[in-house]
């Protein structure tokens, strides 16, 4: 109760930062002491941290205010929450008794995936806000988001093959790769609308459209990754079905 109510005296994103730190600290204390209450409390506080973080997003990014690039409380708080969630996942992996606990629990792989989601959202919200507020062009934020999305997926899938603590199941790699490709294809009409707006109303922003061609190259890399994942992990029947779906897309 004290752990949940103490940070209420703080303001805004400081509550989220406090709960993120406290969740990691309490789980670490549980591993050292074996006190089950610390373990359960850490997980509950982590969930409340996510709720608080969502409220921070609404308050910060819906205000319409011009925020400093990178050095703003929205991005910093989200990155901190992602880091705390990742460290919590590492602690859960060290918990040899974790599989034997029948009560409420959050697995390490779920924490790891949520940490990656938070990391992704941190960049996506920052890019969307900065380009929406600072530039008058409609869909320019979408253009840069569609550069960020495939770049993020490529980097994460590459790191997951190099760093043991970042290893992801192939199903997750397949899902995020396919989702990234589909999101790009879905946004193609926005690219044409932006191109028309730039040519007719703002030719000084023509250089921005170079980002679109870079995005196309990254999406081509994702297509290659998707094919490699399917070949490595799907049987012949599923592979044929997947091939038809890919070409249909």
Labelled PLM ranges:
Residues 1-249:
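Alpha-helical transmembrane segments of multi-pass membrane proteins
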């Amino acid at each position: 109760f004290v752990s949940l109510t103490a940070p209420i005296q703080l303001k805004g994103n400081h509550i989220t930062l406090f709960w993120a730190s406290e969740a990691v600290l309490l789980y670490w204390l549980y591993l050292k002491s074996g006190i089950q209450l610390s373990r359960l409390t850490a997980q509950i506080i982590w969930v409340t941290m996510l709720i608080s973080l969502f409220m921070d997003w609404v308050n910060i990014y819906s205000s319409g205010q011009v925020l400093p690039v990178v050095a703003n409380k929205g991005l910093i708080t989200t990155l901190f929450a992602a880091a705390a969630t990742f460290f919590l996942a590492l602690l859960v992996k060290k918990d040899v008794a974790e599989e034997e606990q029948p009560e409420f629990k959050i697995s390490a792989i779920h924490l790891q995936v949520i940490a990656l989601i938070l990391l992704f959202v941190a960049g996506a919200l920052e890019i969307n806000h900065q380009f929406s507020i600072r530039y008058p062009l409609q869909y320019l934020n979408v253009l840069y988001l569609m550069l960020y999305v495939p770049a993020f997926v490529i980097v994460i899938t590459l790191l997951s093959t190099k760093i043991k603590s970042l290893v992801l199941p192939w199903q997750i790699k397949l899902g995020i790769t396919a989702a990234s490709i589909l999101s790009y294809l879905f946004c193609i009409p926005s690219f044409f609308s932006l191109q028309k707006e730039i040519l007719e109303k703002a030719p000084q922003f023509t250089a921005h459209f170079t980002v679109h061609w870079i995005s196309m190259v990254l999406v081509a890399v994702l297509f290659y990754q998707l094919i490699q994942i399917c070949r490595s992990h799907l049987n012949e029947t599923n592979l044929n079905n997947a091939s038809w779906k890919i070409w249909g897309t």
